[in-house]
Every structure is written in C-alpha cells, then in structure tokens.
Regions:
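Structural signature of alpha-solenoid helical repeat junctions
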Residues: 2, 41-42, 81, 120-122, ...
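"A position-specific structural signal for the A-helix of alpha-solenoid helical repeats
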Residues: 8-9, 42, 49, 81, ...
C-alpha cells in the first residue's frame, strides 16, 4: 500500500475528538500528495477530506485553498461520484452562518451520482444540513420538507441516531403551533441526545445555534 494512503487512512480512522492528531497527519502529507500520489481521484478525495477538517476548525482561508484543489481535480477529470466534497463545501459555509452560500453546494451534494444512486445515509446527512440552512433563512416549509425526507432516508441507517433533524423539526412545529408534532419530534430529539457523550457535541466547534442548544439540553439531561 502507498504510504500516503496508509497514513491518510489512519487520519480518517481517528475519533472526532482527535481532530488535532488528524490535522497533523494531513499537514504532513499535503506537500507530497500531488507528486507522490498518481491517482487524481485519490488526490481529489484527499483534498476534499482535508478541507472539510480545516473548515471544522475554522481555518477557512486554508480550507478554501484545499477546496479549490479538490474541485480542480473533479472538474478536470469529470468525476461524478464525489458528492461528499460538495457537502463539505456547503458545510464550510454553515460553520460561518452563510446560509445562502451553503444551499447550492448542499443541493449539488444531494444530486444523484452518474449511476443514478446516492447512499441513503449520506442523503440523510446532506438533507439535514440543507434543511437546517433553510430553517435559518426562515424558509420554514422548505426546511420541513427537506428534514422529513432526511429522516425518512436515514431510517434504516446509522443516520437515524442523529439528533439534528429532530431538533429542527421540533423547532419548526413549535413555530407553526403544532403542539402534538412538536412533542413527537422533541421526544425523538431528546432520546437521541441523551445517548451521546459531551465530546460528540463540542467537536471541534459549536457555532450553530442548534449545536449550542443541544449541548445545553444534553447537560440538563445528564444533570451537569
């Protein structure tokens, strides 16, 4: 196995709370990728992964530079199965509360791949992100539609453990005055939240209002 691939796999295998160790690996590998990694598909994936992690820790200028490299390889080679890189781009804007800028990238991530298929787990995560952006823009009906689709897509996957779509749905139904639906989704939200560890809610930023509220709610559930 190419040693770059091996170290990259190590970075990807680290837990979310180990992001500093992961960043150190990516920083070491970055200068070598374009000279020692011959497969341009792998290069696109590497820079896509790297900029996603950089965005998570608010290194936005550096993230933009790595994103440009990933998109260059995607465009030049016509790759159509790397939707997660578009999601990472949209997520970078979400971290900065740039909801309008995030939406086109999240919509692009949700487009089906060239073979007409997209992973249901990813569909759930991408749809939740899109629904959250729409919610923050006050586009409540559109947000509701995307979030319900995300919940449905994630039912049979690990995404069903995610608290975020249920948080937004209970907020939506609270705004709409639909108490029964609000109570339903609040219960689903809290059920998932209490199963988490604190590190799951503070990695590596908690800039979204949803994340901050979830952390507060988690502390109440945990009697902290």
């Amino acid at each position: 196995m190419n040693p770059i691939i091996k170290q990259w796999d190590t970075a990807k295998s680290l837990k979310r709370c180990q992001y500093k160790e992961a960043l150190a690996i990516y920083e070491t590998l970055c200068p070598k990728v374009e000279t020692e990694l011959s497969d341009t598909f792998d290069r696109a994936m590497f820079f896509g992964d790297y900029f996603g992690l950089l965005a998570d820790v608010a290194q936005y200028d550096k993230a933009e530079a790595m994103a440009a490299k990933a998109l260059k390889y995607i465009t030049e080679n016509g790759y159509t199965t790397l939707n997660y890189i578009f999601y990472n781009y949209g997520n970078m804007y979400l971290h900065q509360a740039k909801w309008e800028e995030a939406i086109p990238w999240l919509e692009k991530a949700l487009n089906r791949n060239s073979d007409g298929w997209i992973n249901e787990k990813r569909k759930a995560y991408y749809g939740t992100a899109l629904g959250g952006a729409l919610f923050h823009l006050g586009r409540i009906d559109e947000a509701e539609e995307e979030l319900l689709k995300a919940v449905e897509a994630g039912k049979a996957t690990v995404a069903n453990k995610d608290w975020e779509p249920f948080f937004y749905l209970k907020e939506i139904y609270k705004q709409k005055g639909e108490e029964k639906l609000m109570a339903k989704y609040e219960k689903m939200y809290l059920t998932r939240l209490k199963k988490l560890k604190e590190e799951d809610l503070i990695y590596p930023l908690s800039e979204h209002r949803a994340n901050k509220q979830a952390l507060e709610d988690w502390k109440k559930l945990s009697n902290l």
